Amino acid sequence: ESSNKRENQKQIVDKHNALRRSVRPTARNMLQMEWNSNAAQNAKRFADRCTFAHSPPHLRTVGIFSC
């Protein structure tokens, strides 16, 4: 799977961070995103279900992080 390869993960993270840096107005305290394997696995589980909808909030929590 392509998202498991470090090079692809780096491209995803770099692009995401570049897009976040380009927001206007700029954020005062926007943290840089890092790859999180647990979050990636969680996203893949949801994507594998192939539904066109947002996941419920309780499924968007990985460790102490939620989105």
Curated annotation (Swiss-Prot):
Gene3D superfamilies: CAP. Its main location: secreted. Residues 13-58 form the SCP domain. It comes from the Eukaryota. GO terms for molecular function: calcium channel regulator activity; toxin activity. Keywords: Calcium channel impairing toxin, Disulfide bond, Ion channel impairing toxin, Neurotoxin, Secreted, Toxin. Contains 8 disulfide bonds. It is found in: Secreted. Pfam families: CAP. GO terms for cellular component: extracellular region. Expressed by the venom gland. SUPFAM superfamilies: PR-1-like (SSF55797). Belongs to the CRISP family. Blocks contraction of smooth muscle elicited by high potassium-induced depolarization, but does not block caffeine-stimulated contraction. May target voltage-gated calcium channels on smooth muscle. This is Cysteine-rich venom protein bucarin. It comes from Bungarus candidus (Malayan krait).
